[in-house]
């Protein structure tokens, strides 16, 4: 879908660049595939802020997306493409041959009326899902499972994808958008194609208020806070912090590695940080 600009009648309109969503369905989502969604304003179960700078925003309804694609060998027709406020990608309402309705992530080049199917051996075309061990090397995939039967976890944002670049016994080797290469079991499911709405990266929010509609509040720097609020806070007049940059909890920021070693490290063949060192 194309990008949309506006007449510069105000500064917010001048800078605004949106994705043209005129081809999407304009009605409400299917009610039986939705759930209520309670906004917590960045607070945890004790009522304390656990994620800073969140709160407000437009009320949203959660769409139940099928990330597992376990209904095998039953063809489904794409009924409509929809906007989903809970994610950057678009979603597709599909109707199976037995009448069941479901939402899936819409891949690029999927259109209303197309047929998709999940199974062990299916055609390599956008929207079809099968175990990655049965796909040819070089296939572009999204909604990739990391554990067998858990449902897709990787490559779900707008425009993202992973590419199968090799095989190693029961595993396939994936190259992710970040540059990381990792092994995933060949029986893990993935959907063929790249995720829709690839122009999302080229949008411009245009004004602060539009960010507030998304539920994001202003992000304050530590040096403008009081000493009680941040290690960089305090000082008479403007100061530069006076110490190496740290988080509000005193941990070094600006690139210090904080990830602990995990048992899954052995599946990462090339780290996503490698290309930053070149």
Curated annotation (Swiss-Prot):
What does UniProt list as this organism's lineage? Bacteria, Pseudomonadati, Pseudomonadota, Alphaproteobacteria, Hyphomicrobiales
Similarity section: Belongs to the universal ribosomal protein uL2 family.
Organism expressing this protein natively: Afipia carboxidovorans (strain ATCC 49405 / DSM 1227 / KCTC 32145 / OM5) (Oligotropha carboxidovorans)
The keyword Ion transport belongs to this UniProt entry's keyword annotation:
no
Q: Which UniProt keywords apply?
A: Ribonucleoprotein, Ribosomal protein, RNA-binding, rRNA-binding
Output a single Gene Ontology CC term carried by this record. Answer: large ribosomal subunit
Entry-linked PANTHER family: LARGE RIBOSOMAL SUBUNIT PROTEIN UL2M, RIBOSOMAL PROTEIN L2
The function of this protein is:
One of the primary rRNA binding proteins. Required for association of the 30S and 50S subunits to form the 70S ribosome, for tRNA binding and peptide bond formation. It has been suggested to have peptidyltransferase activity; this is somewhat controversial. Makes several contacts with the 16S rRNA in the 70S ribosome.
Q: Which domain of life is it from?
A: Bacteria
The cross-references to SUPFAM superfamilies, in alphabetical order and at most eight, read: Nucleic acid-binding proteins, Translation proteins SH3-like domain
Is rRNA-binding included in the keywords of this UniProt record?
yes
Per its record, how is this protein called by name?
Answer: Large ribosomal subunit protein uL2
Gene this chain is encoded by: rplB
Q: Which GO terms describe its biological process?
A: cytoplasmic translation
Q: Which Pfam families match?
A: Ribosomal_L2, Ribosomal_L2_C
Single GO term (MF): transferase activity
Q: Where is this region: Disordered?
A: 222-278
Assembly and oligomerization: Part of the 50S ribosomal subunit. Forms a bridge to the 30S subunit in the 70S ribosome.
């Amino acid at each position: 879908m194309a990008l949309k600009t506006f007449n510069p009648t105000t500064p917010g309109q001048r800078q605004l660049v949106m994705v043209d969503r005129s081809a999407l369905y304009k009605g409400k989502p299917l009610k039986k595939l939705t759930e209520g969604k309670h906004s917590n304003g960045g607070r945890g179960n004790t009522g304390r802020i656990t994620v800073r700078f969140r709160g407000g925003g437009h009320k949203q309804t959660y769409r139940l997306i099928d990330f597992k694609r376990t209904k095998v060998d039953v063809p489904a027709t794409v009924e409509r493409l929809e906007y989903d406020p809970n994610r950057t990608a678009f979603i597709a309402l599909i109707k199976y041959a037995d009448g069941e309705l479901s939402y899936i992530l819409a891949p690029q080049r999927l259109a209303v009326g197309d047929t998709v199917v999940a199974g062990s051996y299916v055609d390599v075309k956008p929207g079809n899902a099968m175990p990655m061990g049965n796909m040819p090397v070089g296939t572009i995939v999204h909604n990739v499972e990391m554990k067998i039967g858990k449902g897709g976890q990787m490559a779900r944002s707008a425009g993202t994808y992973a590419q199968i670049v090799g095989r190693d016994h029961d595993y396939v080797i994936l190259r992710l958008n970040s540059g990381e290469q990792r092994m995933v079991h060949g029986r893990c499911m993935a959907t063929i194609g790249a995720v829709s709405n690839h122009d999302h990266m080229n949008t411009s929010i245009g004004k602060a208020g539009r960010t507030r509609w998304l539920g994001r509040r202003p992000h304050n720097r530590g040096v403008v806070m009081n000493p009680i609020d941040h290690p960089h806070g305090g000082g008479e007049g403007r100061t530069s912090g006076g110490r190496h940059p740290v988080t509000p909890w005193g941990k070094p920021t600006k690139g210090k590695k904080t990830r602990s070693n995990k048992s899954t490290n052995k599946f990462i063949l090339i780290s996503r940080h490698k290309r930053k060192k070149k």
